[in-house]
């Protein structure tokens, strides 16, 4: 039986920390669905299509990965619909745990067959967050050690377009 998991997030943008968690998840699961979820509480720099495109480019040579978009609905229901028994979440710091723990309990209530698996990234990514990457890139800082080259190019392009307006 194939072990399936979903790895949800806004991934705005997808960082090397996200990639590290994905690679760790693939040592446990046969297939991981990266699920881009829209978050109404966050304003996105990149469109869903741009984020999907970048993640697909980054994971093109990685077997066992599928990039999907959740258009509304509950994550626990989506997990059930694809046959996933786990939701993968990355934890960088202790402060991430409280929120993620609440979500895991809710998802478990909504779908008792799904378990949340918390994975810690390599220590060199524990302070890397998409919001920090966006801000540093906006201010002209070098984020090349924290994102894939395609993400770096898209960040530069996006901020050049914004500055031209």
From Swiss-Prot:
Residue sites binding ATP per the record: 10-11, 18, 90-92, 100, 125-131
Protein name as annotated: Phosphopantetheine adenylyltransferase
Cofactors: Mg(2+)
UniProt-listed Gene3D superfamilies: HUPs (3.40.50.620)
Recorded family membership: Belongs to the bacterial CoaD family.
Residues under site feature: Transition state stabilizer: 18
Source species, domain of life: Bacteria
EC number annotated for this UniProt entry: 2.7.7.3
Residues noted as binding substrate in the record, renumbered to the chain: 10, 42, 75, 89
NCBIfam families found in the cross-reference section: coaD_prev_kdtB, cyt_tran_rel
Stored PANTHER family: PHOSPHOPANTETHEINE ADENYLYLTRANSFERASE (PTHR21342:SF1)
UniProt function note: Reversibly transfers an adenylyl group from ATP to 4'-phosphopantetheine, yielding dephospho-CoA (dPCoA) and pyrophosphate.
A Gene Ontology molecular function term of the record: ATP binding
